[in-house]
Amino acid sequence: RRVAICNDPDWEINPRVHQEFHGLGQVPIEFPEIESTYTAAEAKSEAARCFRCDAETGSADYTVSSRESIFAMARIEPGDTDRQASILDSRLENRVNPFDLAHLATLDDLVFLPANLSRLVIDPYREGCVTATRLGANRGLDLDIPFTVAGFDDAPNEIREAVAKSIEQHGAAYVGARPIGAGARWIQVVSTGTDAEADAVVFDADRAMADDAFSGGSASQPVGLLVNSANVRASVDFALERHLDFLLLDPGNGLPGLAGELAGAPDISILRRAVARLRELDREEEIDLVYFGGLRTGTDAAKALALGAIAVTVGAAMALALGADISGGNPLFDADLDAAEREQRSYNLLQAFTAEASMMARCTGKTNLQNLEPEDLRAITLIVSHAAGVPMAGSLHQH
């Protein structure tokens, strides 16, 4: 603790001190000194350079300026009030806002509250986490996991076959204009007429609301609306009036393709606005919400479930897992993969999504993915707090 201070006024620009190399010597087995040792001055200079490394890679709490302030305060005399006031003023200055007006609200700025703040974390070795989901408030479609896949209507057959097998194996469902495979559940995006083979059907909300004779699918098929950011409020009212089963929220307005999702960051406020309208009408349990857009990981999916969705739809992430090139705005499947590799990749993606989402639920003390709720989340930026309807970290105030 009594080593001389190694702080150097030139610590930011000190060059590296190179030790002279002497080789292994005539008798290497005797382990001679192969490099010259540092002098005291050189050792202090190198220690100062280490301080620079720490400062450049340190946490936000200990930036370069804050560390320099600490050293300055350590050398100040008790009676030097002017310098004390100067240091205090510098510490009270607001830092530059790293998020300008163009900063978008994304799921990255939402974090989960750990369960040990209020309850016990769930041990995966002792208790499982339920992932089974019933999609549809009235006529339900039973899924083993709360995930559906979309965007492969125009993909090559070998890609569709791989995705279909993974969907079937996981007990998920495919969202598209045509079925992806005989064994995979299919939620039909209706353009002309409904298919009796579809496990559920979803209609474009604007077209459905403009059609006075809209009646939905068959009596046994769950019926939903494909909703975008512009018509979410009217779609909620219409769906409740017609006793529909679910709303598929697509802020990019691109389903059944992936162009909308790949065009930019999704509008995550669509979930908050849909839930807010349902709560305003006191009919939150009468219809289910499915979210699509920008989901890259199981953590993203868990955040969407916590914000009010009962299931989510994976699109671009699955395409990327299968080696797609998305630089042109639509996925181009040109990766050199054989059938086994494609099947394994698509299977692994859904497996990873499910495992990671379950992990987030367990970390919040939940044994069912559907028990995730907005109270399990906090926002770290004001724009996301407003978009998602979630309080800022360290606060109960919702912006």
Identify the meaning behind each predicted range:
Residues G171-A172, A198, L244, A309, ...:
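A structural motif
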Residues R1-L88, L92, A230-N231, G260-S269, ...:
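Ferredoxin-type iron-sulfur electron-transfer modules and their immediate structural context
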Residues R1-A4, T63-R67, G181-A182, L226, ...:
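A glycine-rich phosphate-binding loop feature that marks nucleotide/adenosyl-phosphate handling sites
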Residues G329-L337, R345-H399:
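Catalytic or ion-coupling anion/metal-binding cores of large enzyme and transporter domains
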Residues G25-V27, L143-V149, P251-E261:
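Gly-rich Lys/Arg/Thr-decorated short loops/hinges at beta-loop-alpha junctions or inter-strand turns
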Residues I145-A150, N157-G217, R233, D237:
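Catalytic alpha/beta active-site cores
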Residues V201-E341:
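Glycine-rich phosphate/ribose-binding loops and adjacent secondary-structure elements
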Residues E56, T63-E168, A172-A173, P374-H399:
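Conserved, well-structured core domains of diverse proteins
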